[in-house]
Regions:
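A short acidic, Gly/Pro-enriched loop at the edge of an enzyme's catalytic core
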Residues: 128-140
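Class I SAM-dependent methyltransferase SAM/SAH-binding core
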Residues: 72-128
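Membrane-proximal basic amphipathic "stem/tether" segments
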Residues: 2, 230, 250-305
Length: 305
């Protein structure tokens, strides 16, 4: 319980930076337009390192269940990275895509504040994802987000529980990002590929995901040309009950909510988060206004200092 609460508290302390980043990215016209030119919103679904069509059902199979393939973009932030349709042969197949993030309330406020006509983000937490959607998704996408969670292994198990048997979980992450970012903000875990295995680790723990999934899922892991770690996991059987405990999850949430309520209303955490947001928002106001190439150069100089 204490470990879960510590993970939650560390994650909460990373919220101000994340909100300041998106608030100012959406503030400036050129950064917002740059985001849309990079994302596949309104375009064909594109997944780096694989053919997206190979992990989605045929139009006939999708129609037999829900009419459209269900795709969950978990930890989506405000990136709108995946596309909205795919080509089934020559036929355009629409996707029921849901952008899911625990900070949905804040992101939707930013959308409204910046007058952006984009789909609202749906609330959902990777570590408790099956409480929102269970056994019906065709594809779960987690990009640059699993290593930002407070319990990434639990996030993988929960993602698999949302899939029907035969569904896919697609992961795409920068290698060892917590090490790169010095464990600041949401960066508490590293993801890497070692001899075809997916490893999730930090200074306190290390897990072999291939070993964890043995018997109920297959996994293909590779490092693509730009260095990203891409893993494609196919659910082949139901997740063993020994790997999750819904009652324990409820206890964790109740306990964490109680502590959070106390800390916020005691004033300490509330003031700390407000001060952190004010600081990061000030910094991001200027950082996001800079040309992209200059931002990259400054980041490299800071790391070398």
């Amino acid at each position: 319980m204490d470990k879960a609460n510590n993970g939650m508290n560390n994650w909460i302390e990373g919220i101000p930076y994340e909100l300041a980043f998106w608030n100012n990215l959406y503030r400036w016209r050129w950064t917002y337009e740059g985001l849309l030119s990079w994302s596949n919103y309104g375009k064909e679904l594109c997944l780096e390192g694989i053919d997206a069509r190979s992990v989605l059902p045929s139009a006939t199979a999708a129609a037999a269940r829900s009419g459209k393939p269900i795709v969950l973009d978990v930890g989506a932030g405000m990136s709108y990275a995946p596309g909205n349709f795919y080509l089934n042969g020559t036929e355009r197949q629409e996707i029921d895509i849901r952008y899911i993030d625990p900070l949905a309330f804040h992101y939707n406020r930013i959308l409204k504040k910046r007058h952006k006509n984009l789909p609202e983000v749906t609330f959902g937490v990777a570590e408790y994802l099956s409480s929102c959607v269970a056994d019906e998704a065709d594809l779960v996408i987690i990009q640059n987000a699993l290593d930002h969670s407070f319990a990434p292994i639990k996030g993988i198990i929960e993602a698999l529980r949302t899939l029907h048997t035969g569904g896919f979980l697609y992961l795409n992450h920068h290698p060892n990002e917590a090490e790169t970012e010095d464990y600041k903000g949401f960066h508490k875990f590293n993801i890497c590929e070692e001899h075809g295995k997916l490893i999730i680790w930090n200074k306190e723990s290390r897990r072999d995901v291939n070993e964890l999934l043995n018997g109920f899922a297959t996994i293909d892991v590779k490092t693509v040309e730009n260095g990203h770690i891409v893993a494609l996991i196919k659910k082949t059987a139901e997740v063993p009950a020994s790997l999750y405990d819904d009652k324990a999850s409820i206890r964790e949430l109740c306990h964490s909510n109680h502590l959070l309520f106390y800390q916020v209303y005691s004033g300490h955490l509330s003031m700390k988060l407000k001060c952190s947001y004010a600081f990061y928002n000030f910094i991001q106001f200027f950082v996001q206004a800079l040309p992209h190439n200059l931002k990259i150069k400054l980041k490299k100089l800071i790391k070398q200092a």
